[in-house]
Swiss-Prot record:
Binding partners and assembly: Monomer (in solution and for integration into membranes), homotetramer (in solution and potentially as a toroidal pore in membranes), and potenially homomultimer (as a toroidal pore in membranes).
Glutamic acid 1-amide sites (modified residues): 26
Residues under site feature: Important for the flexibility at the center of the helix, flexibility that is important for the stability of the voltage-gated pore: 14
GO biological process: killing of cells of another organism; monoatomic ion transport
Name of the featured protein: Melittin
Sequence positions bearing N-formylglycine: 1
Species in which this protein is naturally found: Apis dorsata (Giant honeybee)
A molecular function (GO) term: protein kinase inhibitor activity
């Protein structure tokens, strides 16, 4: 359901953003 999708986004998005920020700093 949508709740599972939101849960995945809420946990995965911060990690993805921090990873992108690290990659862009290099």
């Amino acid at each position: 359901g949508i709740g599972a999708i939101l849960k995945v986004l809420s946990t995965g998005l911060p990690a993805l953003i921090s990873w992108i920020k690290r990659k862009r700093q290099e």
